[in-house]
Amino acid sequence: QKEDGSHMGESLDIVRYFYRQDSSALDEAVRPEIQAWVEVFADWGNRLIMPRDVQLDLPEFAAESSVAYFKGKKEAWLEASFEQLLQETPRYLAQAQEALRVLDGLIAPNADYVNGKHLSMEDILVFPLLRNLSMVKGVAYPDNVAHYVRAMSQAAKIPLFFDRAV
């Protein structure tokens, strides 16, 4: 809730709001190839990530009712059970590896930011996807992506899930 009592429903609206409060401008430029990558990720990424969300002992899933609600909503949306999606991991993991190879070519070597210069909307869009993908056992990040995701994790103090990947 904002000071005026209004609410923000979209996470990107929240990001923009905090940047305005800090009097700094977020570079909102997103290269078309990064936008396309994010959109393609949604096709297979959710099928890898969502079944694992509830298996990682995340605080938001501490209550069984939270797990049941999330599972019911997401299975209906994905039109597949989490069990079925976990069995299809090899198929979606192959798509993930190909997408990561593409993304690797869009990130400069040793870059701490997707655009290679500074924090931007590209990071706001890409980092959460890569962080969530780290919960998938067997995912292998190519060099540029691996450097980026670790650098962003450290800078943001947001841990990755490699140590408990499923």
Please report, for each region that a protein language model flagged, where it lies by residue.
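Aromatic-enriched hydrophobic runs in primary sequence
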Residues: 1, 33-34, 90, 112, ...
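GST-like domain detector, emphasizing the conserved glutathione-binding G-site
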Residues: 1-72
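Small-side-chain structural scaffolding
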Residues: 11, 122, 161-162
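Non-transmembrane alpha-helical segments in soluble domains
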Residues: 12-15, 19, 35-38, 97-100, ...
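A general structural signal marking secondary-structure boundaries and capping sites
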Residues: 22, 107-110, 156
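Short, hydrophobic secondary-structure boundary micro-motifs
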Residues: 26-29, 113-116, 160-164
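GST-like fold's C-terminal all-alpha helical module
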Residues: 43-151
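Alpha-helical oligomerization segments
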Residues: 139, 147-166
